[in-house]
Amino acid sequence: MEASFLSPPAKRSIYTATGMPDPIPMAYAPNGSSKRSKPPPPPIPVPAGHVAFRLLCHASRIGGVIGKSGVIVKQLQSDTGARIRVEDSPSTSDHRVILVIAPASVNRRIALQGSSEEVEASAAQEAVLRVFERILEVAAVVDGVPPGGVVSCRLLAETSQVGSVIGKGGKVVEKIRRESGSKIKVLTAEKLPTCAASTDEMVEVKPFLFIYLWISLFFQFTGYLWLSRLY
């Protein structure tokens, strides 16, 4: 069964792999935005050789990704070596943006969820995979999304970056589709969540597991890394 990231909010607690309850932190309102008014965090520079990804997560699931006092997101950072930050969103947004910044060089082998296969990967690839795996764990409890279903992942990118993914006449994206076996769509502007910038477009990759291959082939065919920027 296909699931999306647009499920209605739920009030149940999130359970970790140990079976212990991991309630959504009280510091976050039901839409995932902070209850307390506070200045926005300073921008994060993207060092040379690093790549930045902005992942979309429904607000009803973001508490389970963050964890109580940030314990889960801190563990994800420790495990992958990535910088991970949940960005503030307008109160009208049903989604939050998870910013992932990590080295783009391939330097490790990782196991893919639901498979005994190990693949070579960069810290960026591993971090994106692990964040989405956590989102799916939360979704299974909060929204009853069954394991093994076809689930898509959605990322935000600036229009100029999306142009590099598509290529002239759609040649690049078609080659990535053939090589990875994934379905890739650039969604129309009216489907953008309010947490997106006016210069953003949304890329959907399905099934989510192919995000690993998609990132690899994206680098290979476009040579495009999102460097020296502030987020």
Task: Please provide the spans of the model-predicted regions.
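Periodic glycine anchor positions in long extracellular repeat architectures
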Residues: G67-G70, G167-G170, P207
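Alpha-helical bundle protein-protein interaction modules that mediate dimerization/oligomerization
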Residues: R154, Q161-E179, K183-L187
